[in-house]
Every structure is written in structure tokens, then in C-alpha cells.
Amino acid sequence: MGKVHVYDHPLIQHKMTIMRKVETGTKQFRELVDEVSSLMAYEITRSLPLTDVEIETPVSVSTQKMIAGKKLGIVPILRAGLGMVDGFLKMMPNVKVGHIGLYRDPETLEPHEYYLKLPTDVTERDFIVVDPMLATGGSAVDAIASLKKHGAKSIKLACLCAAPEGVERVQAEHPDVEIYLAALDEKLNDHGYIVPGLGDAGDRLFGTK
């Protein structure tokens, strides 16, 4: 079963607390999502393989390290996942970005896919699916399944805030996928929102409902 990584870095926790506050406005919320995403990208890529390369510095020839292995891809789940993309791109500016569009049925809380655009070389990439919230887990489960259907073999999931119910569902349906979180909260409420959570991330990111 895929591991769950919850980051306790002081900067991440501090920024998450400000993000959670009901009085935090759209501009600051957007900036915080971007900042926490960059910090998470730094941690998630810690295990990337390295290879030795010979370079010439202004002083001498030297053997140094560069990232090796498969190319990376980021796939935000629309729309809220878009808020995390720039934070990841600051750390990994050359990665390709796919998109998966899902909306949640207000009655069943289950997701429905309406858009999918992936790099043409899916089988040659390690993917990081990004979505600020992991609530019921339905959107993440479907997004991961869509990637696998198109040939993806290595997938990670990065979320700012998660409920145990969502984590358990992803682990049950995709045990090969590692999950990376800035916060693991208490539970879901009767409306499918994470408690204490941070509200509707998409609404708070874009200022619309």
C-alpha cells in the first residue's frame, strides 16, 4: 500500500494555518497555495535519482550531479488544482503539465470527467497529480485511473489538506500511489467538506462560487 507523507515543516504548517482562516482573502490565499506547493515540490522530489556528469566551471573540470531517470509531469485536477501548478513549476520549470477536468455531483458527491489533456509521452513520465483538497477521494481516484488508462505507471498524489476517508479510499483503489499532504485533518462533515479544512479551495482561489 502506498505510503502517506504528512509534512510537518514549520513553514508549511504556519502557512497552512493562515490559509485556513476564514478572514484570509483571495489574493493572500492564492499566494499561500503557491508557496506551500513550492515547499511540497521540494520535499516530494527528494528521492529523484541522480547521475554523475562532467562539467566545466570557470575554474576547472568537475564531476557533479544532475537529475536522471524518467521525465516528470504535473497533472492538476481542474479547477482548484490549477492553484498548485505554478508553485511546482518554480521548482521544476521544464516539466510538462496535463489537465484533468472533474466536477462533483452535489447529490452523490461523486466526480464526473469532462476534460482530459495529457503529454503524448505518458508512458515515459513520472506523474504528480495535484489537488488542494482530498475529501471523499473520488476525484483523485478517478484522475489516477484516467492516467493509468492512458499508460502512466508511476503516479504520486499531492494535496494540501486531506480527510482520512479520502486517504483510505485512494489507498484502497490505488495502493501503488504515494500520497503527499501538508495536513491530514479530522474527518468529513455531512456535506463532504473536510473538517476543520479550509473551505472550498476553488472558490477561495478564484473568488467565485
Curated annotation (Swiss-Prot):
Classification via HAMAP family: Upp_B
GO terms classed as biological process: UMP salvage; uracil salvage
Means of activity regulation: Allosterically activated by GTP.
Protein name: Uracil phosphoribosyltransferase
Keyword list, A-Z: Allosteric enzyme, Glycosyltransferase, GTP-binding, Magnesium, Nucleotide-binding, Transferase
Recorded GO MF terms: GTP binding; magnesium ion binding; uracil phosphoribosyltransferase activity
NCBIfam families documented for this protein: PRK00129.1, upp
